């Protein structure tokens, strides 16, 4: 995907300034991502520190719009100035495609890291944003669960692989397949935060129940406690009575995990995915883009507060 360009209004919004605060000598009709990065340095407009977050987007139920959500979320965090690594865990390579790339074009995937001990740094690719990197996926990833099966410490392979690069990123985002196996177990064991995209239908409850049972077993058996679990209602259509009833049920049964932000049904998500572009590139003024920004606005203060409450841990990771 070619690098996008931005208007002065968009740039000012990303930097948290008014357009008039952009230095006159730096003003242009259109700005590239590199231009924006230079402006950040000039104006010293970097976002608040998050520590080093590892965030997993997962639902054992398919069809929840998880990949469109995770890739647009990662893209927007990068636009806002965070250093982001997006790791595609799905052998279908949909997250890779949403960034405008074909997984088959890459020789190495996470399989090489977890099974063949290739350093993660050798698999990481650059995107069209200077501060958004990604690990691609393709059909070779379909064998990773089987390959991990006989290995000692198999559930910790991903967590250990991240240690060599984690200090370079504010956020690592995992886009996981809708299944439970050793790869997703690795992702759960590596994650600080779990995002669970759900549809407002009653079929989602079964998947949620199974996922929360898995999270609880990780706490009890492997002593791994997630910092945050965020349930995100995706593709919501308020004109459907059943959708409203399902939302009310989610609010009743999962109030402590359910984000107040709702991602409304938006055709731009499907269009953007088919074009190999995040929704913030396809249509930055769409409902989908606005709702993901609202979700980020809701989540970031919690992450900033968590980082501030654990300075010793953050300093240790940064070193």
Residue ranges, per PLM feature:
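Conserved catalytic-core segment of NTP-binding enzymes
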Residues: 80, 166-167, 171-267
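P-loop/Walker-type NTP enzyme "switch/lid" segment
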Residues: 59, 83, 89-167, 222, ...
């Amino acid at each position: 995907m070619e690098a996008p360009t931005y208007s002065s209004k968009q740039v000012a919004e990303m930097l948290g300034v008014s357009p008039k605060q952009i230095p006159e000598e730096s003003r242009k009709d259109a700005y590239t991502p590199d231009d924006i990065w230079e402006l950040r340095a000039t104006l010293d407009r970097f976002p608040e520190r998050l520590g080093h977050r590892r965030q997993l987007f997962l639902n054992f139920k398919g069809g929840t719009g998880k990949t469109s959500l995770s890739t647009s979320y990662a893209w927007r965090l990068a636009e806002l100035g965070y250093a982001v690594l997006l790791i595609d865990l799905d052998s279908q390579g949909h997250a890779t495609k949403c960034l405008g790339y074909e997984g088959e074009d890459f020789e190495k995937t996470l399989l090489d890291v977890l099974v063949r001990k290739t350093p993660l740094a050798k698999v990481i690719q650059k995107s069209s944003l200077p501060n958004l990197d990604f690990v691609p996926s393709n059909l070779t990833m379909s064998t990773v669960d089987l390959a991990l099966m006989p290995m000692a410490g198999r559930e910790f392979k991903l967590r250990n692989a991240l240690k060599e690069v984690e200090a370079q990123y504010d956020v690592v985002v995992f886009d996981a397949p809708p299944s439970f196996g050793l790869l997703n177990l690795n992702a759960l064991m590596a994650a600080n935060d779990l995002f669970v995209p759900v549809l407002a239908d009653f079929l989602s409850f079964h998947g949620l129940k199974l996922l929360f049972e898995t999270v609880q077993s990780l706490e009890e058996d492997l002593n791994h406690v997630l910092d945050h679990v965020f349930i995100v209602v995706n593709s919501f259509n308020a004109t459907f009575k059943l959708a409203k009833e399902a939302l009310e049920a989610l609010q009743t049964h999962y109030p402590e995990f359910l984000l107040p932000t709702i991602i409304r049904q938006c055709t731009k998500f499907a269009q953007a995915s088919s074009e190999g572009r995040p929704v913030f590139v396809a249509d930055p003024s769409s409902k989908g883009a606005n709702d993901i920004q609202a979700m980020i606005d809701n989540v970031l203060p919690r992450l900033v507060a968590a980082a501030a409450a654990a300075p010793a841990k953050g300093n240790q990771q940064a070193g």
